[in-house]
Amino acid sequence: MDSDRCLTDEISLNTLSSTFASDNNLRRKENFLKSRYPSKFDLNVSMLTKSDDVGKTPFSIFDSPSNPGFSRSHQMCSDKNKSPFLFDKIRDEPVSVDPVKLIINNRNKRKINRQKSRLQGLYRSDANGLQPLNSENVKMKKSTALSLTSSPLNSWKTDFKTPPKANVVCISLVIEGDGCASLLYEDLNQISNSCPEVAPNRQNALFSDETLTTMFYSGVTEDEGSCNNLLQSSFGDDLDLGMQRSATWAPGYNYPSKFDSIPFASASPKIKAAFPFDPNVYALNTNDGPVTSTDNNCDQLNTRMQAWNNGFNYSNLNGDIQYPAVTPKFFQQEGRALNVSDCNFGNEEIAYGGIPMRVCHSDSTLCDARIAAKQALKGKRQYDTSTSKAELSTPPSKRRHIDDADLVFHSSPLLSRSRFICCYCTKPFLSISKLQEHESSCSHVERLFGFAPNRLYDDGDGFLGSSFCSDW
């Protein structure tokens, strides 16, 4: 009798404890949801009494299609063998594809922090990233740290990949004969392939010769066949305008594959029509008429190219405007100028087809960069027909990929506030103060054609106008 009574009491206690456990579980679920959502939501709690329904969600609100916000909680609460309080489902899902973040968000954060502190003691930070310290003690600590964790060591090491080959682009502002201004796009990498015999391992190498004054820049000798890398440190932001600069490039000129010892003698450069200038090309400092392709060893000269030089008679469509003369004294102090040469007249000036003008020395540095990027897209559009119009209308900074071109351009000539040409210089000045000191020695010329207030400049200030920059 006593044994039966004890058995009955034990069964009653087990039943009561299971009932309490079930009620406690439901109460925890109810309190959990009430703590997560404001009390203004009517949860419509309906307690379940059947044993088969234990573990199911007791809230009818989740069955309503008008409450999609609770679908995540409903999935967690209704899933059997899962507790809604441990957030197993959320924790098992990776929050990022970054391996460092995946390690940091690991469950055992204390172990990760210990690992990170150990690894930080093993490496020193410099310009090349995290570099290991050379000592026997550090090597021993490194092996100890690797044995304490299974996480990869490279997760904390900065991995620098070699940047893609830069597509050096030069944007030139060209003043046409009728006073209109236009932009010209040139890809320097296509030109750099012209001297593979001299610099086969330099993909960005460019020719520099004593007569190729447009390619003269610091760190390069004037010996025949000398090349240099456009991406070296000497092409930094010389004017502190936030732009990287390259060597000066005169559009309209094609390099030959090889130069002889006498420039333009047996390997004359090939000329391509690029400037819609005055149809008559005159010899320098003379009024003898247009220069033909046989004069001054110039090969395949296109008469549509305009030669600009000292005392050159520049005429517009009416023939009554002369290009102002500029004294060449200050050109020799800061690099070689485009229209100054020790050779006989009519060689590189005629061959290059004019002085390319850049508009980078202004208050609107970002505006100039946008102009260059927009013009580069125009030049690329005719070659890339697969690009959609939506991609072309998006600024490059917002749609840039790893293989996109890097726009590199510079300032020449430098324009003062009074809209005068300060100087034509293939090597930019190293600082603004040096430019201001040098500006006093510049021979100011008349206002450049095409820079009227209704064209490129606003009234009064002499800088790029908003109408010229807003079309982006």
UniProtKB/Swiss-Prot annotation:
Localization per record: Nucleus
PROSITE patterns given in the database record: ZINC_FINGER_C2H2_1
Keyword Nucleus: yes
GO BP terms: regulation of transcription by RNA polymerase II
Zinc fingers typed C2H2-type, residue spans: 420-444
Keywords: Activator, DNA-binding, Metal-binding, Nucleus, Transcription, Transcription regulation, Zinc, Zinc-finger
A GO-annotated cellular component: nucleus
GO molecular function terms attached to this record: RNA polymerase II cis-regulatory region sequence-specific DNA binding; transcription coactivator activity; zinc ion binding
Highest taxon in the source lineage: Eukaryota
Physiological role: Transcriptional activator that controls the onset of premeiotic DNA synthesis by regulating res2 and some other factor(s) in a mei2 independent cascade.
Protein name from the UniProt record: Transcriptional activator protein rec16
Organism: Schizosaccharomyces pombe (strain 972 / ATCC 24843)
Lineage, top ranks: Eukaryota, Fungi, Dikarya, Ascomycota, Taphrinomycotina
